[in-house]
Each structure stands twice: as C-alpha cells, then as structure tokens.
C-alpha cells in the first residue's frame, strides 16, 4: 500500500515538473519575440498577489529552457516563423506592444509599487526609488530604463518624478506636492486613485497578446485560461476599488452630522456678535484708501481714462526754488526746511478731474473726513482729557491714584542731537512708576540702544514683559521710510514698544496684532492707532501717558509731561488732591459746577444702560 502511495506521489511530481517546463518553454518562445511580455505578466501577477494578500514568486530567468520531451508539446501545431509573428504584430496596431519605451516601463513599476501600499501612506520620490531598487524583481534592464528616462541631467529619482508627473497630468491618478530638501526639489505622493492608477498597467497589452497567441496557436489551453483569469480579475479590480471607497450609510450619517455641528460652531452667537459690535468704530470707518500712484496724472496714464480713481491722490508742490531733477524729498511732509528745500514735495489733491461744465451730471459730494480719533467710542463714554505740566522725575505720583493702562515714551539718551532734553539711565530706573498701578498693563516705547534697558526698567518696576509691538513707519506717500533720522549704522524704519503686565488685570486678549503700519508725523509723535488698541484691550479703565505733549492729549487719558500747557483737571477728587499737594499751581478750567458734572455722569450712565438693553 505504501509503495503505491509513493509511486503516485512521484508520478504527480513528474507531471508537475513536465508541465512547468512546458510553460517555461512557451514563455521563453514568446519572450524572444516580445521582450516585455514576461515583465508585464509579473507586474500583473504582483498586483493580484498584493490585493489577495498572497506571496509573489517572480518568473525565473528564461535563459536555457529546452523543449521538454512530452506528448503535450508534440501535439502542438507547428510554430510559425519569427518573420510571420512580427508581421502579425505590425498588423495589430497596438502602441504598447509595438514599442516599449522607458517611460512605459517606469510607469508600470511605479504604479505597482504605489498599488502595493495597503493602506496607502504618503511617500516621497526618493523613498519610492529606494523601494523599487531593493525589490527582488528589479533587474538591470529595469535600471537601464530608469537611467535612460532620466538622462544625463539627473539620477533614477528624476525618472520616478517624471513618471509621477506623467500620471498626474494624464488622468490625475496621483495627488502630488513639491517640497525642498537640502536645496533639492522633491515630490511627495499625497494620495492615489487606484482605479485610474490601474490603467497605467499593461493590462490592455496582455489582453491583445492573448488574442494574438490564440490566432498563432501559441501555448496550450491551460496558459490561455490563466491569461483570461488574470484579465478578468484586473477588470474587476476597478469595481472592487470603487466599492471599497464608497461610503456606507453610517459613514454618510456621521459626515452629515459633523458638517452640521461645524456649521453651528462657526456661526457666531448673539453674545459674540454683540461683543464684536462693541469694538466697531462709532459712526463707521473714516478711512479713505490711498491710490498706488501718487498723482492723478499717473493714475489716468495707467488706466488710459480721463478720470482718475476715487482713492486719495497727491499733487506736486513746485516752488520757484524746486529742482524737479532731484526727485522727491526724502522727508516729504516732515521736512524741516520746506521753504528752501529744492526737492519735490506733495500735498493732498482735492480738485475734481473735470470741470463741472464738461461733466454731464454734477459729481457726488465728497464725504467730509472727520478729525481722526483714536478711540472707538464717544467722548461721553471716555470722559474729558486731563493733563499736568510737571517734571516726572520728582512729581508726586501717589496723588493721581491707580490706572489700568500706562503708556510712556521716555526721552532715552541715544547719544545724538535731539530737539528735546534726555534722561539718564539711572533716572529712568528710579522713576516712581510702581505708584501708578497695582493691576494693569504698561506700554513702554524704546529705541535700539535702550531695548535691554527698557526690559530692565520693567522688571525693576514690578512688571513681566509679555509682548513687543512694532511700528513700521511710512512716509506721506504711504511708502516704507528709507531715510530716517535715527540709527547709527542703518536708517531705522521701525520702532519698538515693550508690553508689560502687573498683577491680574481684566483685559481682552487676542483682538489686535503686534504690528502697526502708520505714517510718521512730528518728532517723537507715536501713531494714534495705539490709543484705540489700548482702549480695546482694557476698555473703561483709567489711563495715563508719561512724557506726553499737547498732541497726545486724548479723551479719557491723563497726560503728564514738561511740554504741556499748564494743568487741566476735571475730576473733583483729583483736583482736590492736586490742590492740597501743589497749592500755588493754577488749575484749569475753573472749578466745574456740580450740575455740569452730574449731567456728564448721567449721560454716560444713560448710554451704558442703552447699550446693555441692546
């Protein structure tokens, strides 16, 4: 019994070996006519193996396969000549089989490598080339195809990138993104479309080859059956991939629910809308944009029209001493020698483009620009401006009370000629700033040299430096300043403001930016946008400015400095404390009547109640 079993096993092995040699001989015969046939077949089998999660064994080299001595081969019809086979291939106009280009080889290999990544994860072109190079089926002929496609200008990675771009351009089979690594451009494959990527495989060529084999009677029935199964599986892969990618009903429900939740989250609530409206400028924005071209003539010349745009323009001031060949004045509006400067200066141009007699209809009246205010709320809400002309170094800060916001623009000693006096570093350190604040913010303007000194002063006064605001300076024509009056080595086109915090103040966070782009004006005058920013950050609190001038006085602010006009106090308690400390100093205005003060308080209360009801 055991003898019969061994004989059956040996007989089966012999039949398998004979069948294997028969198949290899037929493959070798076809390979001699169509060089790319075996590699295309291996690629298709590798794709099927990856989808079925089965190991893949490549076809061994077809070098010395002799025809097996089997009755099955003897029954085969006579093999036609090579000339007849080539003639039949030419008749069948198949570009894939007529000419195998290096691009088609690289496209097939890259497509197989991308399809074998289950699930798909992002991969870059260099990593993709390494995976192809380390594959056991990678032959020297394949490497030669990569080198031929890349040419002398690049390596195999360039060939991979050429194939990826070809896939993306032809049918959008891959989603690509370029990035740079060490100065070299690389491609990242973000996602793939398996249905479209399968079209890069030579399935059509295999199908036509099978038809030609049937006509030429090459191969036995088993091989034709295998080819038919491969083609059928390849055609069904698209349907399977589409079915896998299709979302289920539960996934669709989750997607719709998430979409509705996102819409609800992004919609501002009534409270958020009210808070946003609170910080809008009362009466609407008063801003009028400037045109990119300075004059109306330049604007008309660019547009080819007789009428310039509605934006603000300038007109050149040409005096008797002006030399147009010198160009624009570096300082423009801030020039200190306007009467003798030979450069060109500018002023705003309010004149209409055409006289009224030439216009069919009267032009719309220009909206009058109100005086620009830094505050976003009314004077009644803020209160009246107050100031004290004093020497801040020895002034009694304790009589002023506590403030929520402090802004200071000290006259730092920057070792340059300035039109005002400066303070020594030790005098800055010993200022009695801590008496003005327990909980709040301080905004300290510093120069380049005083940057670290300002941080030291903040720490000495009890503050923690948390932010830094940058003011980018522009000139009258809204261009970046290139010839500033400050700077030892380079012209300074910006200034810095250190922001310190003390205690636990109640402030509005993340409602403003740390960069301000604004036009320069008088010496040491800071942009008015600072006052609006501080009012938004800490609304309704008392605010004081140190080292102020008359142009710095604002509603709701207390200003201290030695260049102010006398003393103006409207707060009764503050007037009393100041009179007690400095009885010989005259205070303006005359002591306001209690009725006027009560009217001011009642108006503020009424506006507060109205806004609360809204």
Swiss-Prot record:
Catalysed reactions listed for this entry: an adenosine in mRNA + S-adenosyl-L-methionine = an N(6)-methyladenosine in mRNA + S-adenosyl-L-homocysteine + H(+)
Superkingdom, natural source: Eukaryota
Main localisation: nucleus
GO cellular component annotations of the record: nucleus
InterPro entries according to UniProt: MT-A70-like, SAM-dependent_MTases_sf
Region described as Positively charged region required for RNA-binding: 479-492
Keywords from the named record: Methyltransferase, Nucleus, RNA-binding, S-adenosyl-L-methionine, Transferase
UniProt family annotation: Belongs to the MT-A70-like family.
Protein name: Putative N(6)-adenosine-methyltransferase MT-A70-like
UniProt organism field: Medicago truncatula
């Amino acid at each position: 019994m055991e003898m019969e079993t061994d004989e059956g096993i040996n007989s089966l092995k012999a039949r398998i070996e004979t069948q294997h040699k028969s198949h290899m001989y037929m493959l070798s015969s076809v390979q001699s006519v169509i060089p790319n046939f075996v590699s295309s077949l291996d690629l298709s089998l590798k794709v099927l193996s990856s989808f079925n999660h089965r190991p893949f064994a490549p076809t061994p080299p077809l070098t010395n396969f002799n025809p097996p001595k089997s009755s099955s081969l003897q029954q085969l019809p006579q093999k036609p000549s090579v000339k007849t086979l080539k003639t039949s291939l030419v008749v069948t106009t198949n570009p894939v089989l007529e000419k195998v280009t290096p691009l088609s080889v690289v496209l097939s290999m890259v497509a197989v490598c991308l399809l074998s990544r289950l699930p798909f994860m992002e991969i870059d072109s260099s990593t993709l080339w390494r995976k192809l190079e380390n594959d056991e089926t990678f032959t020297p002929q394949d490497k030669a195809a990569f080198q031929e496609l890349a040419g002398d200008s690049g390596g195999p990675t360039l060939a991979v990138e050429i194939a990826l771009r070809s896939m993306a351009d032809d049918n959008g089979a891959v989603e690509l993104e370029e990035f740079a690594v060490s100065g070299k451009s690389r491609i990242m494959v973000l996602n793939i479309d398996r249905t479209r990527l399968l079209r890069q495989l030579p399935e059509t060529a295999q199908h036509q080859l099978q038809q030609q084999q049937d006509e030429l009677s090459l191969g036995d029935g088993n091989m034709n059956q295998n080819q038919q199964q491969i083609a059928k599986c390849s055609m069904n892969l698209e349907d399977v991939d589409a079915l896998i990618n299709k979302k289920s009903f539960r996934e669709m429900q989750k997607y719709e629910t998430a979409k509705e939740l996102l819409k609800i989250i992004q919609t501002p609530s009534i409270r958020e809308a009210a808070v946003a409206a609170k910080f809008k400028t009362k009466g609407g924005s008063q801003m009028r944009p400037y045109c990119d071209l300075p004059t109306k003539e330049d604007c008309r010349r660019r547009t080819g029209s007789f009428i310039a745009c509605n934006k603000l323009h300038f007109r050149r001031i040409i005096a008797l001493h002006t030399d147009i060949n010198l160009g624009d004045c570096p300082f423009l509006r801030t020039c200190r020698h306007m009467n003798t400067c030979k450069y060109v200066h500018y002023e705003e141009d309010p004149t209409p483009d055409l006289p009224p007699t030439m216009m069919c209809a009267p032009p719309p009246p220009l909206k009058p620009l109100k005086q620009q205010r830094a505050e976003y709320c009314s004077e009644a809400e803020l209160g009246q401006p107050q100031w004290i002309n004093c020497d801040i170094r020895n002034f009694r800060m304790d009589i002023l009370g506590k403030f929520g916001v402090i802004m200071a623009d000290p006259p730092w000693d920057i070792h340059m000629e300035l039109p005002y006096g400066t303070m020594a570093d030790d005098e800055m350190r010993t200022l009695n700033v801590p008496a003005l604040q327990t909980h709040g913010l301080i905004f300290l303007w510093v120069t380049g040299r005083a940057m670290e000194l300002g941080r030291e002063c903040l720490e000495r006064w009890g503050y923690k430096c948390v932010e830094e605001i940058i003011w980018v300076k522009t000139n009258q024509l809204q261009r970046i300043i290139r010839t500033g009056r400050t700077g030892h080595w380079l012209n300074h086109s910006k200034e810095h403001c250190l922001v310190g915090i003390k205690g636990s103040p109640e402030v509005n966070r993340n409602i403003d930016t740390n960069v301000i782009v604004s036009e320069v004006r008088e010496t040491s005058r800071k942009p008015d946008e600072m006052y609006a920013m501080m009012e938004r950050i800490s609304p309704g609190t008392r605010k004081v400015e140190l080292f102020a001038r008359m142009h710095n006085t604002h509603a709701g602010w207390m200003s201290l400095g030695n260049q102010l006009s006398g003393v103006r106090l409207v707060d009764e308690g503050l007037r009393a404390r100041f009179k007690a400390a400095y009885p010989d100093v005259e205070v303006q205005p005359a002591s306001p009547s209690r009725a006027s003060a009560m009217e001011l308080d009642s108006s503020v209360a009424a506006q507060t109640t109205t806004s609360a009801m809204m």
